[in-house]
Swiss-Prot record:
Segments on the Virion surface face: 1-22
Family in the record: Belongs to the influenza viruses matrix protein M2 family.
Residues carrying the site annotation Seems to be involved in pH gating: W41
Topology in membrane: Single-pass type III membrane protein
Activity modulation notes: The M2 protein from most influenza A strains is inhibited by amantadine and rimantadine, resulting in viral uncoating incapacity. Emergence of amantadine-resistant variants is usually rapid.
Upper classification of the organism: Viruses, Riboviria, Orthornavirae, Negarnaviricota, Polyploviricotina
Keyword tags: Disulfide bond, Glycoprotein, Host cell membrane, Host membrane, Host-virus interaction, Hydrogen ion transport, Inhibition of host autophagy by virus, Ion channel, Ion transport, Lipoprotein, Membrane, Palmitate, Phosphoprotein, Signal-anchor, Transmembrane, Transmembrane helix, Transport, Viral ion channel, Virion
Site, Essential for channel activity, possibly by being protonated during channel activation, and by forming the channel gate and the selective filter: residue positions: H37
InterPro entries with a match to the protein in the record: Flu_M2 (IPR002089)
Modified sites of kind Phosphoserine: S64, S82
Regions that span the bilayer: 23-43
GO molecular function: monoatomic ion channel activity; proton transmembrane transporter activity
Additional record remark: When the channel is activated, one or more imidazole moieties of His-37 probably become bi-protonated.
Protein's UniProt name: Matrix protein 2
Organism: Influenza A virus (strain A/Swine/Iowa/17672/1988 H1N1)
Length: 97
């Protein structure tokens, strides 16, 4: 019987558990795995931006600009920006009635 389905009932003015097989090793292992899964899920939801950014980009923060003249850095920035700029002519205007 799972720990999640145990029923607590008053026994002699105390709260007890009507579960005889709670010492089963499989139940203990399943409970530990469930608790670890819950902890990892909570951490994932709290830090998902940091975690997935680390997987996507690793430890690098972009190309190194050490020893590169400022004019070449600016040219590189302009090329990068022009690569992501969107031409307005590619959009289709849809008019709803």
């Amino acid at each position: 019987m799972s720990l999640l389905t145990e029923v607590e009932t008053p026994i002699r003015n105390e709260w007890g558990c009507k579960c005889n097989d709670s010492s089963d090793p499989l139940v203990a292992v399943a409970s530990i795995i469930g608790i670890l899964h819950l902890i990892l899920w909570i951490l994932d939801r709290l830090f998902f931006k940091c975690i997935y950014r680390r997987f996507k980009y690793g430890l690098k923060r972009g190309p190194s600009t050490e020893g590169v003249p400022e004019s070449m850095r600016e040219e590189y920035r302009q090329k990068q920006q022009s690569a992501v700029d969107v031409d307005d002519g590619h959009f289709v205007n849809i008019e709803l009635e």
